[in-house]
Amino acid sequence: MKLNTIKPGIGSAKPKRRVGRGIGSGLGKTCGRGHKGQKSRAGGFHKVGFEGGQMPLQRRLPKRGFTVYGKKQVREIKLSTLQLIDLSEFNPSVLYDHGLIKNINDPVKIILGNQLIKRAIKIKDLIISRGAKEAVEQMGGLVELTVKDVNGV
């Protein structure tokens, strides 16, 4: 087999449209564009959303809502993920060192997930869900919070 002998599979590629090659081809004379009108001309077509002078839909509908530019995305980490790291104390710098977060200043929330933890751990300076906090304390772990919510208040 050589590169110049490779052909696409049967039915996988449509044949090229040869227009303007006689009426017997089915695409002669007007080349499948019909007679006259804007769409038959070269370069003649309307822009997307144009409705022939009628007020377009995107302008008929009212504006709604706004974009919050200062919103911070919270990175959620499951307790079962922390179980995979052989440490007993977790804080933002530990999560950063192990590659669980990309920026040490990004807000992180520890969530329960679907698996329970098997050992006592200490969580410091991280946002934690109620279920995760109960699971940590049930195993004899400790949760020290200095961060109350996403904005650090």
Curated annotation (Swiss-Prot):
Q: Which UniProt keywords apply?
A: Ribonucleoprotein, Ribosomal protein, RNA-binding, rRNA-binding
* Pfam families linked to this entry: Ribosomal_L27A
InterPro entries (alphabetical): Ribosomal_uL15 (IPR030878), Ribosomal_uL15/eL18 (IPR021131), Ribosomal_uL15/eL18_sf (IPR036227), Ribosomal_uL15_bac-type (IPR005749)
GO MF terms here are: rRNA binding; structural constituent of ribosome
Region of interest called Disordered, as start-end residue ranges on this chain = 1-42
Top-level taxonomic group: Bacteria
Family, per the entry?
Belongs to the universal ribosomal protein uL15 family.
Q: What does this protein do?
A: Binds to the 23S rRNA.
Entry's HAMAP family?
A: Ribosomal_uL15 (MF_01341)
The protein depicted here goes by the name Large ribosomal subunit protein uL15
By which gene is this protein encoded? rplO
